[in-house]
Amino acid sequence: MIDKNVIQICKERLVAQRSDLMNRLHTHRLEFFERETGGDEADQTVSLLNENRMFIAQQRMRHQLMEVELALSRIEKGTFGICEETQEPIESQRLLAIPWTRLSIEGAEIRESQDQKRA
């Protein structure tokens, strides 16, 4: 069983992380629409490279936001802190470090070895 204080701390961190990610995504969106277009070929190339970097950063932030939302959902359902691989409680230190994690250290090792076998 996960300590209720750990769950509360994780929930607070997740809510703060969600807010930060949403603000950053909004800022990226504004920057995208405010960018300058036109210019010579070199300017257009730099612009395309910057757009690509922004797109990749937004994808990462959206993925992280999804993980945060899923973790908050698990808190509401009462399944937060249970490893998806082993069905055992995730270590409190790990949850405090990575509150959106779905795997214990053991579960992460199992999943990693399975992924390596598939590759």
Spans of model-derived segments:
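Amphipathic alpha-helical recognition patches that constitute DNA-binding helices
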Residues: 9, 85, 99
